[in-house]
UniProtKB/Swiss-Prot annotation:
Function (record text): An accessory protein needed during the final step in the assembly of 30S ribosomal subunit, possibly for assembly of the head region. Essential for efficient processing of 16S rRNA. May be needed both before and after RbfA during the maturation of 16S rRNA. It has affinity for free ribosomal 30S subunits but not for 70S ribosomes.
Family the UniProt entry places it in: Belongs to the RimM family.
Record localization: Cytoplasm
Keywords: Chaperone, Cytoplasm, Ribosome biogenesis, rRNA processing
GO cellular component: cytoplasm; ribosome
One BP term from GO: rRNA processing
Gene3D superfamilies linked to this entry: PRC-barrel domain (2.30.30.240), RimM (2.40.30.60)
Organism lineage string: Bacteria, Pseudomonadati, Pseudomonadota, Alphaproteobacteria, Hyphomicrobiales
Subunit structure, interactors included: Binds ribosomal protein uS19.
An MF annotation (GO) of this entry: ribosome binding
Protein name: Ribosome maturation factor RimM
Gene from which this protein is expressed: rimM
């Protein structure tokens, strides 16, 4: 398991006083205000969210040490991480996306498909990205039907390839 987990990404500046748009990756967006110190990926900068309000599908937040629009603009695109021990424990069948990255992906017969490269959400649900050793990346819906088994301790996810892309249907060019 990873020692730190990405919980938010700083977006565009908001207003003139250093507020930023904050895209959170937590079930409860406001939870980032309770985690204490958030750091950049390299750990070089630390921030605390001192104030946040929900606007549409993001937060408008005030971060410690960011007081001008120019400072806020320079942070656009910065990912913010929190120490794993600050996060709540997961329930049975739940996990943090960070725990999936790097797991082996195998089909239901145990044949290797590749490695979990990322989990995406483009608005219509989670997508699991599998990077095979050779060939194109697989982007599959992260549903119980397609990913019936997530075995963090065993270091693998089991993929039930959807019929539309499993290669069993002939090309119709």
């Amino acid at each position: 398991m990873t020692a730190r987990v990405c919980v938010a990404r700083i977006g565009a500046a908001h207003g003139l006083r250093g507020e930023v748009r904050l895209w959170t990756f937590t079930e409860d967006p406001i939870a980032v205000t309770r985690y204490g110190s958030l750091s950049t990926k390299d750990g070089a900068r630390q921030f605390e969210v001192t104030h946040a309000r929900e606007v549409k599908d993001y937060l408008v937040a005030t971060l410690t040490g960011v007081t001008t629009r120019e400072e806020a603009e320079r942070l656009n695109g910065t990912d913010l991480y929190v120490a794993r021990d600050k996060l709540p424990a997961t329930d049975e069948g739940e996990f943090y996306h960070a725990d999936l990255i790097g797991l082996a992906a195998v089909d239901v017969a145990g044949k290797p498909l590749g490695t979990v490269a990322a989990i995406h959400n483009f608005g219509a649900g989670d997508i699991i990205e599998i990077a095979p050793a050779h060939g194109p990346t697989l982007m599959l819906p992260f549903t119980d039907a397609v990913v019936p088994t997530v075995d963090i301790a065993g270091g693998r996810v089991v993929i039930e390839m959807p019929g539309e892309i499993d290669g069993d249907t002939p090309d119709q060019a």
